[in-house]
């Protein structure tokens, strides 16, 4: 989904890795605009010129960070590969489980969920790139299953609303976690709790899809 890293300047290079490790904390805390590359370089224990050498600019560092964490997310929670004969409900459940893990798992090495939430709230030039390389492939997988569920006659607008309703259930736990923890003091997203959340979203979504399908049939009866 994302381009392969240049081996000569990969995330494994000690200086590059040090910069990425510090940059994730700075960009998440301060946002892209307020983040200072001088602070990142100082905290990483490298010269400021190292950012230009490895990334070209502040913008290049930020985009590389997004791509690095998106790649980590794909590797740790890849899209499920299921036989087409597997019942559609099970395939949707597997897709939602992977999406939830990719975006919300606090134990994942990827921080792409929080990065993308920040990017959506305060867009930069990186948004178009990340939309094409990270967001759109996931949406297209979901739309493919929804098209299979609804059939060819249902307008794309209906599919998009259904897809956004499913994705929105996942994202709200990342965006509104300070509110959720006040509503539920023992709220947790680790291990089995994350699995239960994914199952809930899948069950809720499947019921909603069935209601939408009945509505569509009624409109065309």
Locations of regions flagged by a protein language model:
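N-terminal intrinsically disordered/low-complexity leader segments
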Residues: 1-14, 214-221
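Helix-turn-helix
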Residues: 18, 26-60, 64, 68
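Short hydrophobic clusters on alpha-helical segments that form packing/core surfaces
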Residues: 19-27, 166, 205
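Short secondary-structure transition hinges
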Residues: 73-84, 103-140, 187-195
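Hydrophobic alpha-helical connector segments
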Residues: 78-112, 159-166
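N-terminal hydrophobic signal/anchor transmembrane helix of membrane proteins
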Residues: 89-105, 109, 195-216
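Hydrophobic/aromatic-rich alpha-helical bundle segments in the mid-to-C-terminal region
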Residues: 111-113, 127-136, 145-202, 212-221
